[in-house]
Amino acid sequence: KEICFPRLGCFSDDAPWAGIAQRPL
């Protein structure tokens, strides 16, 4: 599964930073 951001692009949700996906940048 991947998470996509308009400004950041797409990343795997198993990446180390995945926890940020649940928080506003």
Curated annotation (Swiss-Prot):
Functional summary from the UniProt entry: Plays an important role in fat metabolism. It preferentially splits the esters of long-chain fatty acids at positions 1 and 3, producing mainly 2-monoacylglycerol and free fatty acids, and shows considerably higher activity against insoluble emulsified substrates than against soluble ones.
What this protein is called in its record is Pancreatic triacylglycerol lipase
Q: Which reaction does it catalyse?
A: a triacylglycerol + H2O = a diacylglycerol + a fatty acid + H(+); 1,2,3-tributanoylglycerol + H2O = dibutanoylglycerol + butanoate + H(+); 1,2,3-tri-(9Z-octadecenoyl)-glycerol + H2O = di-(9Z)-octadecenoylglycerol + (9Z)-octadecenoate + H(+); all-trans-retinyl hexadecanoate + H2O = all-trans-retinol + hexadecanoate + H(+)
Q: Which GO BP terms, alphabetically?
A: lipid catabolic process
Disulfide pattern:
C4-C10
Class of enzymatic activity (EC top level): hydrolase
Q: What is its EC number?
A: 3.1.1.3
Q: Tell me what controls its activity.
A: Inhibited by bile salts, is reactivated by (pro)colipase/CLPS.
Q: What is its main location?
A: secreted
Localization per Swiss-Prot or TrEMBL: Secreted
Q: Source organism lineage?
A: Eukaryota, Metazoa, Chordata, Craniata, Vertebrata
Entry keyword annotation includes RNA-binding = no
Q: How does the record describe its quaternary structure?
A: Forms a 1:1 stoichiometric complex with (pro)colipase/CLPS.
Question: What molecular function terms (GO) are annotated for this protein?
Answer: all-trans-retinyl-palmitate hydrolase, all-trans-retinol forming activity; triacylglycerol lipase activity
